[in-house]
Amino acid sequence: MFRGVATVSLDSKNRLVVPARYRDALLVNGAGRVVVTADPGQCLLLYPLPEWEPIEKKLTALSDFNPRTRSLKQLLVGYAHDIDMDSAGRVLLPPMLRKFAELDKNVVLVGQGSKVELWNEARWEAQVAQALSFSSDALPSELEGFTL
């Protein structure tokens, strides 16, 4: 289970040092094998391989006849990269994915249960500001009556 927010720096070889609390979960669930892919929100998604496999299976089973479905499948499956976390707990992010998410030195990791989102720091701050600006009138129906 991934939760919490952490800001980390990419090293000189564009490797992401995975925080210990996430690293342990990745080692237990997938032996350090991860899949990193693009997200329509212009961040990256990092999954332990066992969590990604059923998602990929569902995605590849979708029909290509609907253009929106096909585009989403192309994005998520097309950008997916299998990556092995090294013994120091680092993940090498491919240039194509770094460019897609506009990742530079500082990367924000956001735990989301079964996955971790990787954000450009400025884009993450804008995302948080947008979330704080929502009024209760604009809540989706599935959140009505939801309490913390």
Predicted regions and their residues:
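Short, solvent-exposed interaction modules
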Residues: 60-91, 97-98
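A positional/architectural concept
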Residues: 3-44, 49
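Short, structured motif recognition centered on aromatic/hydrophobic residues
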Residues: 14-18, 47, 89-93, 97, ...
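A short beta-strand-loop micro-motif that forms or neighbors metal/cofactor-
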Residues: 28-43, 102-119, 123, 136
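Short active-site loop/helix that positions an aromatic residue
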Residues: 25-27, 96-100
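Short, low-complexity cationic-aromatic patches
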Residues: 7-17, 82-91, 145
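A low-complexity, Ser/Thr/Gly/Pro-enriched, surface-exposed linker/loop concept
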Residues: 42-45, 49-67
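Acidic/histidine-enriched, glycine/proline-rich intrinsically disordered or flexible terminal extensions
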Residues: 131-148
